[in-house]
Amino acid sequence: MVFNIRCLAAVGLTLFCTYQAHASEPPPATAEGSTPAQTLLERGKYVAQLGDCIACHTAKGGALMAGGLELKTPMGTIYSSNITPDVDTGIGQYSFEQFDRVMREGVTPAGLNLYPAMPYPSYAKMSEDDMRALYAYLLQEVPAVKLTNLEADMGFPFNQRWGLALWNWAFVDNQPFTPDPAKTEPLNRGAYLVQGLGHCGSCHTPRGMAFQEKAMSDAGSSGKHYLAGETVEEWRALSLRNLWTVEDTVQLLKTGQNRFATVSGNMADVIHHSTQHFTDADLTAIASYLKSLPPGKDDLPMPAVASVPAVAPDNLFSTRGGLGYTQFCADCHRPDGGGVKGMFPPLNGNPGITAANPTSLLHITLTGWKTAETAAHPRVYTMPGFARLADDEIAEILSFVRTSWGNDAPGTTAAQVTKMRQQLNPQTTDSTAFVTPRLANLLAAANADQVVRGMRLHLQTKALLPNNVGNALNCTSCHLNAGTVADGSPFVGVSAFFPSYAPRAGKDVTLEERINGCFRRSMAGKPLPVTSPDMQEMVAYFEWMKMNTQ
């Protein structure tokens, strides 16, 4: 059985760890009257679920556990294997002893050494009881699927698998977990869950020259490296040491979000398939263990209290980064950086925003984001990728985000964006001729103060003109992003068509009259005096948006 676990891809702004029950611990509660065989299979399903087997061994659109999922590594491409009980292409002919050897030593019945993308160095810590339960579940409960495994595409010398035997000799300890008598039972359990089937270190522990994890536990002189953070496949797996409060970590693993952050990338799938199904006792054990680890020398302290959303920064409308944020980000993340609870994450105090390494932030900005689908949050919210923006624009916006609302992280450079774009090769879907105006370019206008104020009157109409708006609408409620979105009633070129004939009025109307028509009807309010500074500023913004339209 060839496991090629996608642990290296399953990371985002926060943590990834999965549960495996201690041999001395009872399995999850089962229905009254269950037979021993049923109890074993239920426990096996739980172990498989908490080990996130589905995420790695089920290709997109593929059969359950039938493999075929692509995993790109620095050495080449490998594919997850078929772990259904099919006797020809799966694991249907494996004895328990053969299965156990694969899981602990990474060696198949045919003597083939597996690549350590399959985290057998961690699985070696599993108890025999849990290993037998997992074996029983895979062979008796998972439907057999006949699907031939795909060959790995690894370059020389990594395609010489005999070298993996030496790697195993140097770095793999195949002995089960041993509790530390100096630790409490909950901490021992948490350590067992994190270090064993959870294989949290596969993503969150730094790697050495031979691509080995620098530590497999927090013990010994190398223990300071354990879970200290690593960059994997253009994602930054943050340090898990001394993580938040126990309650906050439990909430994140259960729901995909807490008051500090929201998971991203493939971690959303991990939450969906795996960690939301953990028992509360197991989640608490994991969180307690992570909290007990002393922070690393480069770790920023995890906040114990969520940041209170601040007012919009003073430079929101006076810098290119601030205006870029206003145009492309503020609708969801709000001018105060507070986001929308349960939907869009806060940016103030968010560890993924303030991390010294901006890898994940760049990844999300270029390719997009989605929330985890969980029982607590069944609706998935998404963020589009912004690869259509130029590298310097993205750098300006992210630098603004990383230094606003109390955030104090280094700025982002265009060179960093360029490098990430080359690595990800993100695809854009904009095939129209519409060119989105950039609000940041307002600052280059001869009348910059006037047109920026005009833009704000469209964006913050209710707040800035309370005597003229009778409901809660802003101009941008209908004309998205201050009239800059292609399919959101844009303002581009509009002023060139005024004065124009209005059938409703039966006469030619000016742009000022058309604006006041919105105040009267759409906003149930009062018109602006045509010669007022506010009206002149709104018209100036329309004139700036005319662009090249004649």
What role is predicted for each listed range?
Residues 37-58, 64-72, 168, 178-208, ...:
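Sequence/structural segment immediately N-terminal to covalent heme-attachment motifs in c-type
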Residues 38, 191, 202, 208, ...:
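Extended non-catalytic domains of envelope/secretory-pathway proteins
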Residues 28-39, 149-182, 287-323, 417-431:
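Intrinsic disorder/low-complexity detector
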Residues 8-18:
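Bacterial N-terminal signal peptides
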Residues 1-9:
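Bacterial N-terminal signal peptides that target proteins for export
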Residues 97, 101-116, 120-193, 197, ...:
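Hydrophobic, ordered structural segments
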Residues 77-93, 98, 104-129, 150-151, ...:
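Axial heme c-ligation environment in periplasmic c-type cytochrome domains
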Residues 21-23:
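Boundary at the C-terminal end of the N-terminal hydrophobic targeting segment
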